[in-house]
Amino acid sequence: METEGVSPDSAAGRGPRPGETMETEGVSPDSAAGRGPRPRETMETEGVSPDSAAGRGPRPGETMETEGVSPDSAAGRGPRPGESVVKEGKASVLFPGANEVFYNPVQEFNRDLTCAVMTEFARETLAQRGVRIIVPGEKDRVVVSLTEEEKNGKETEQAEEERGETEGGTVQEERKQAEFKTAAVGERCEEGLCVLEGLAASGLRSIRFALEVPGLKRVTANDFSAKAADLITRNTHHNNVTHLLETQNRDASMLMYEARGKNARYDVIDLDPYGSPAPFLDAAVQAVSEGGLLCITCTDMAVMAGNSGETCYSKYGSISIKSRYCHEMALRIILHSLDQRANVYQRYIQPLLSVSVDFYIRVFVRVRTGQATVKNSASKQALVYNCVGCGAFHLQRMGKKTSQGKNMKYSAATGPPVGESCSHCGQRHQLGGPIWAEPIHDVEFVQKVLTAVSGNPSRFGTSKRIEGVLSMVTEELQDVPLYYVLDQLSSTIHCNTPSMLQFRSAVLNAGYRVSLSHACKNAVKTDAPAAVLWDIMRCWEKKNPVRRERLSETSPAFRILSTEPTVQACFDVRDDANPQSRKRHLTRFQENPQANWGPKARAKSGGGISSELEDKRKKFQGKRKSQITDSSQLKNFPCKKFRKGTCTHGDKCCYSHDAEQLEPGAGAQTP
């Protein structure tokens, strides 16, 4: 084929064929290439944006009303009629006025905390890859990795440095070159993290990752709803993060199952579903990379706090019980479930941060692989014996490990740790769990996040609250699961309540440790046994007597107060009884930010959301308590027995026998 004088485009069939002519005078290169109007076509471009002229706007002959509409809106990048713009952090997200996609502004704290944790995780992970992240408004910091491999390999690195000096300083030169690699916010980093948000809804969280977290290679925002996926795409263009963020319209579990290969795994997986994350946990523990980060939210707190223990077991493999420590127990239930599912694939978890705030819980865990470490998992889980009378609890480990020289022997634990009835009040025990009985925070990691947030307070809108919550987390006793509540101890024996400083001082004076808990305002987390706590309360009751004649002999209060204390409590206030977070007046427990601030209504699969929770609440309020007292009102309801043909009251029946109120096909009584 002769191609002399013929352009490659013509030879490829994209231009005029031999013998054909094309007038290009006054025609742009795009038009000549077939991307604009064809010959003899005209297109008015006066007042038309370049996007429209390039074929991304209306075609020739089409019209589009742009009066009062911004160019971005006309191009599909701005809000459409009826839509609003939600601004949070550095993101500006388009939001349908009809609330078709789930959005809850109260969870700004959740998203801020996630960005802070991800930033610190990226700092330490990318430091191993020779990349230093840059956070606006933050001073340069020395990075110390939290990985076990680096801690164990310090001596090896020092040996390599010494060897490098003798070989011409090769190691130092390579490290100097690596120090020049930086990753800034909003820039794509080839050595960076791959992030997945499995249930993205409007895409706000993913867009904030792209705009606020440095060191990212790719962010995948997925949602099963086609409307949500379309909105995510529009929001991606609206925030100019198309170079970092990609949209998927897939089932979250299938998307993660397809990423189980070592080279396809995600460094960070964020799951924030409506309700329980249980259906996604199995796929998540497989799709996260070695040492990767899982960020999980649970909003089904009614189930996890003890209202439906059987439902909790079906979802998480653990029975929840009603107790005052239910919020920390919920954290330990989800950690138990994650570790159990990871163990199936010879993997295990390392909790970095676990918080219970507002109406949900949020956990951040690293997932690692190791068959030997997985064998320890049984000894990390425990059953909970909870007294229904006085609230005393005891933990029973599921497994036991003993050291035999260089080897470890694993065996079943022995128990139970309690008798048939409570030794303090004589009541029975409830059995809950199993739960995660190891520390739920990595204090070293939390301290780094706290330092970064407090040193750059303008970065997040909820920085003060993050600082307060994380400060309390660092003050908690990490090796003490669960807690008591001071007002519950007083309520059990029907006496007035000592101040928190007095009670904490009494525990410290008795020779035990004590701390608060971020999960409950009046929590007492201590390694003191329940017997010591009740002795302290008995001593307090002697100073503030209770009228014994009003107590039943079978009540927990009577039995507890009938025993003389063996520990003489001292309630003199100590300086170390007041934690630093309390002295500094940090925002530890935030008041309700707005009316009806809890979880929003569930999104419908076909688009839109269900009725507002406030409307449902008004509709069903007092449904069980307000009984109908006027029997004449019962005539408004059909008789169920008449419908079945079994009513024997006839005309004297207080319910209606009107055939119109019956279901179709339900005949009347036969004589």
Residue positions per predicted region:
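SAM-dependent transferase fold signal centered on methyltransferase-like domains
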Residues: M1-P671
